[in-house]
Amino acid sequence: MITRDYGIVDAWAMPSYPPIAERWNSDPKRAHGVALFGENGFGGMSIEAQVEEMDRWGVDIAILSAIVESDDVKISHEEVAECISKFPDRFRGAIAVDPRQPMKALKEIEFWAAAGFVNLKICSYGYGFDNPPNSKLWYPLYAKACELEIPVTIQVGHTGPLLPSEGGRPIYLDEVALTFPELVIIGAHIGWPWEEEMGMLAWKHPNVYIDTSAYTPSRYPERFVKFLNRRAPHKVLWATDYPAIRYDRGIGELAALDLDPDVERLFLSDNARKVFNLPPSSKAFTA
């Protein structure tokens, strides 16, 4: 048992109650990605059960993401908002929009940010080979996020679903960070097999961070762990991509990393609270 005098923040999670799970698992491209995670898969859990699991492992707040890819809505903003309404102290929302209809997308971002959502989520792989994160397709969204002062989480690294990985090369974020120095950018999913490139960007740019979603601690690349523990502990956010990574592994495997306690607190809580403008932790948790 480990007692922490702070609550953990999960920077990328998703609701997975049955209708969402059915939608997700019925998509062959997504089902392939689900299979890569082994026994957990995606789904079928009530939001109440999700909160119980958070309690058991000391997770105070999770950023719940809507998932919109092209014409396909896997998790709607309304579904995320319903979860937040049930547990307003435990969840915040992340926005996802189709950039091909820019005016509609900008209005949606404004609406959901006004409703309390704290993040904009971008997965460029849903828009083919020709729209990486530095494509002009995304620039209106970046400008709106700057205006609203919300961070943007951008998927980096290979894709689990059968969709293009090219847009996940972290170097594309270099141009975005230079063009929008006011924009807080989070490179999600570590960036493997280009994790050193992602680390370089987080080290170089004051406005660039990394999150660990979709990776259990036992699968963190060795050089990434050194980056976290020694070089830039203030630039990495803990995340799971829940339910793909459940908390028994996402938290249960942390001890093997042998992180300095001050680094662990930054990683598990303080960095995310800063980036997402969350309240300070007022709870102690035992897990």
Per-segment meaning from a language model:
Residues 53-54, 58-72, 79-83, 88-97:
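Short, well-structured secondary-structure segments
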Residues 117-119, 124, 130-237, 279, ...:
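Catalytic pocket-lining loop regions of alpha/beta-barrel enzymes
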